[in-house]
């Protein structure tokens, strides 16, 4: 088991991949440059506000609303960094980058909650996760789609494209394509991207398996924005054991480098298991993430769903406190501005509620059914049903069972 590796001391994790190390390096924007960019972003926000509303009183109200929204999630914490990739500036993994085509529409969509925006299009969703295949070569300890893995596919390629089209008609800032392992349906992935409206960003959620340089190039050319690659330990053997696949760690390194080499934004995703959590382990993981040159690291708390169903995997208060303290140190302390930005949903969900559950996001499973999120499997209907709007309303009214849906 993975616990057997916890006592292993590693000062530095050597890279084991045989391909050349990428020359790509995400630019961490800090210091004076950060202040200049933040000032320019404020100018963009004002421009969007003026586009959305004619009444100057609404301009003031909208600006105050955005300030409250920021404080709601960040509190008084001061941002010390953002990431610049391909000339676009990213403050988070789940918001379009400033200077990207979808940024202004994303902001207008948030303003729509302050007061309905009647000038221009707004998005119904910030993020939608869409599992496009049941196929997977791994058997991960925490897999939330465990009961469906490697069963017969239900949706045809045409139906998959129809689902993407229907969601985009509602308006969505980002669509995250997952599985199973989506890279096992490479031609389907490319076809989905080629046929999609480029108004949305598309991300790949993957173990990294089969993200070769050729596949990374094909996906970039088809319109993929970035890849979220799962890595559950900085020790290769521990990750391989957790994933029940002897080459799992190797493919993580390959995937990150190949994605970086093709100008895809990269993120690592860590399941913060009870066995893993310690300041030492978290820091060793971030050192490796920095070495691999990813822009973001996502912390996902384990949930008792899928392969973890009926297991004591939820973090206790002491473990949560360790992760939260570490998250704040890396993200909001100037001394760690060279490290990737951490995305930690649990931190905000405990304080502000869940924005998924059909409100700002949802999960579409491999049958085309809608669920509150990948970790909350409560189907309310199918995207392709004529009655989809009512299914969506039922999803939103049900909200999230783990956190309040504000």
What do these predicted ranges mean?
Residues 126, 171-174, 198-202, 223-225, ...:
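Short, well-ordered coil/turn segments that N-cap beta-strands
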Residues 135-145, 372-375, 402-405:
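Local cysteine-cluster metal-coordination motifs and their immediate loop/turn environment
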């Amino acid at each position: 088991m993975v616990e057997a590796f916890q006592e292993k001391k590693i000062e530095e994790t050597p890279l084991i991949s045989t391909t050349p190390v990428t020359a790509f390096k995400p630019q961490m924007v800090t210091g004076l440059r950060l202040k200049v960019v933040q000032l320019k972003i404020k100018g963009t926000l004002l421009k969007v506000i003026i586009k959305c509303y004619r009444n100057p009183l609404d301009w003031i109200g909208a600006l105050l609303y955005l300030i409250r929204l920021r404080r709601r999630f960040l509190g008084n914490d001061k941002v010390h960094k953002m990431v610049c990739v391909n000339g676009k500036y990213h403050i988070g993994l789940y918001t379009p980058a400033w200077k990207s085509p979808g940024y202004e529409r994303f902001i207008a969509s948030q303003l729509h909650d302050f007061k309905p925006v009647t000038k221009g299009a707004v998005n119904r969703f910030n993020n939608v996760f869409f599992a496009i295949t049941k196929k997977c070569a791994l058997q991960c300890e925490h897999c939330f789609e465990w009961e469906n893995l490697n069963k017969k596919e239900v949706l045809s390629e045409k139906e998959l494209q129809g689902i993407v089209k229907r969601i985009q008609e509602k308006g969505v800032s980002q669509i995250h394509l997952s599985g199973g392992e989506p890279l096992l349906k490479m031609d389907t992935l490319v076809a989905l991207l080629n046929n999609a409206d480029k108004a949305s960003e598309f991300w790949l959620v993957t173990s990294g398996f089969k993200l070769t340089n050729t596949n990374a190039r094909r996906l970039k050319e088809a319109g993929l924005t970035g890849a979220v690659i799962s890595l559950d330990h900085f020790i290769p053997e521990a990750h391989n054991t957790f994933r029940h696949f002897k080459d799992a760690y190797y493919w993580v390194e390959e995937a990150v480098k190949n994605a970086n080499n093709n100008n895809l934004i990269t993120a690592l995703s860590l399941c913060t298991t009870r066995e893993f959590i310690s300041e030492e382990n978290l820091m060793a993981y971030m050192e490796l993430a920095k070495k691999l040159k990813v822009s973001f690291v996502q912390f996902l708390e384990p949930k008792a769903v899928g392969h973890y169903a009926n297991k004591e995997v939820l973090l206790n208060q002491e473990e949560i406190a360790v992760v939260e303290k570490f998250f704040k140190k890396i993200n909001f302390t100037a001394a760690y501005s060279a490290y990737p930005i951490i995305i930690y949903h649990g931190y905000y969900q405990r304080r502000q509620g869940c924005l998924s559950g059909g409100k700002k996001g949802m999960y579409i499973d491999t049958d085309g059914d809608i669920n509150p999120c990948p970790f909350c499997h409560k189907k309310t209907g199918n995207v392709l049903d004529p009655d989809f709007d009512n299914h969506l309303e039922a999803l939103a009214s049900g909200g999230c069972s783990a956190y309040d849906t504000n």
